[in-house]
From Swiss-Prot:
Basic residues composition-biased segments: 353-362
Gene: RBM48
Family affiliation: Belongs to the RBM48 family.
Composition bias, Basic and acidic residues: 342-352
Name of the protein described by the UniProt record: RNA-binding protein 48
Entries under InterPro entries matching the protein: RBD_domain_sf, RBM48, RBM48_RRM
Molecular-function GO term, any one: RNA binding
Coiled coil: none
Length: 362
């Protein structure tokens, strides 16, 4: 085993338990008080050093407890490591680095046979090949995560660009469609009818973000007409902005807004007593339908469709046995046919005498 920064068996700096951080803000404190420690890949390791294990021969229980968090490759006790009286120190190597991380986080400062465990990483027990393997795995993980992030960002920009292109292509014919009637506006998912054209005044007036109005060259025209033209231009510009915003919202959220039908609106604002009466009426209708269906099935009605195969007659090759079997069949038919059937009015009375219990509203 290779050591990097200290003699094996001696207490190293990263093996010492740090004090609890007292300067942490209240909103950052967890359930248990902890110290502030940042672990990089060179400080993490498959090897975990467990200190504070009571010297009662509980190595089997300790290994079983740590095996809950991952596969353990090897474990052994460190007799030469300095420890407190009546305690032992164990070294456990996990097969995966993530298992070692979880085991350290879960088992650190946990009670075990009356003692408090202290779990820390022990990268000094790694060989050169194990360290290289750990660094290669970390590099592969970083490359994979950055690649996924770049792919996600590229896809996000591409989707935004495609949405802009689709939006511009759909809004390119928007002014022409606004000249049509409300039937044309229903294709654009507009909530109102815009039968009037966007600019129903002089073609010299342009209603856009860079608003410009050319005064007519005729000096005899008064200022009132010019003010009316400006007012119309402002009105059309605001109307066009409202239509563009409505179209953008409808394209951004397709299918999310659904108009309520008149029946749904009426059901929503129906009083509670009326709703209960309506439910009671529906239950009674269901009971009547079930009774009618039972009566129809019980009546001898000719059914159109493929007939089921009849019961095959068993031939016992003995006349006496065949006679006995036929007598038994006839007797069974008489017994079945002699069962009285309740009339239909009694069936309805039974259903009415036992009404369905309504569910109480809490």
């Amino acid at each position: 085993m290779a050591s990097s920064g200290g003699q094996i068996g001696g207490v190293l700096d990263h093996h010492v338990q740090r004090a609890v951080c007292d300067s942490r803000a209240k909103y950052r404190e967890g359930r248990r008080p902890r110290a502030v420690k940042v672990y990089t890949i060179n400080l993490e390791s498959w090897y975990l050093l467990i200190q504070g294990v009571p010297a009662v021969g509980a190595m089997k229980e300790l290994v079983e407890r740590f095996a809950l968090y991952g596969t353990i490759e090897q474990y052994n006790a460190l007799d030469e490591y300095p420890a407190e009286d009546f305690t032992e120190v164990y070294l456990i190597k996990f097969l995966n680095l993530q298992s070692a991380r979880i085991a350290k986080r879960k088992m650190d400062e946990q009670s075990f046979f009356g003692g408090l465990l202290h779990v820390c990483y022990a990268p000094e027990f790694e060989t050169v090949e194990e360290t290289r393997k750990k660094l290669r795995e970390r590099n592969a993980y970083v490359a994979r995560m950055t690649k996924n992030k770049d792919h996600y960002m590229t896809k996000k920009h591409k989707d935004a660009k495609d949405f802009r292109g689709a939006f511009h292509s759909k809004t390119s014919g928007f002014p022409a469609a606004s000249l049509n009637t409300s039937t044309g506006n229903s294709d654009l998912c507009l909530p109102y009818s815009s039968e009037l054209p966007l600019c129903y005044f002089s073609p010299k007036c342009k209603c856009s973000s860079g608003e410009r109005v050319d005064r007519p060259s005729n000096s005899s025209q008064d200022g009132r007409n010019f003010d009316e033209t400006l007012g119309r231009c402002d009105h059309c510009d605001s109307l066009q902005k409202m239509q563009m915003k409505t179209l953008q919202n409808s394209l951004a959220r397709p299918g999310t807004q659904k108009a309520l039908t008149p029946s749904e609106a009426v059901d929503r604002f129906m009083p509670r007593t009326t709703q209960l009466q309506e439910r009671k009426r529906r239950r009674e209708d269901d009971c009547k339908r079930e009774t009618l269906a039972e009566a129809c099935t019980s009546s001898k009605e000719v059914m159109i469709g493929p007939q089921l195969p009849g019961i095959p007659k068993v031939d016992t090759h003995d006349g006496s046995w065949n006679t006995t079997a036929s007598l038994i069949r006839e007797k069974l038919k008489e017994v079945i046919s002699s069962v009285p059937k309740p009339p239909e009015d009694k069936v309805e009375d039974v259903h009415r005498s036992r009404p369905l219990k309504q569910r109480r509203r809490i």
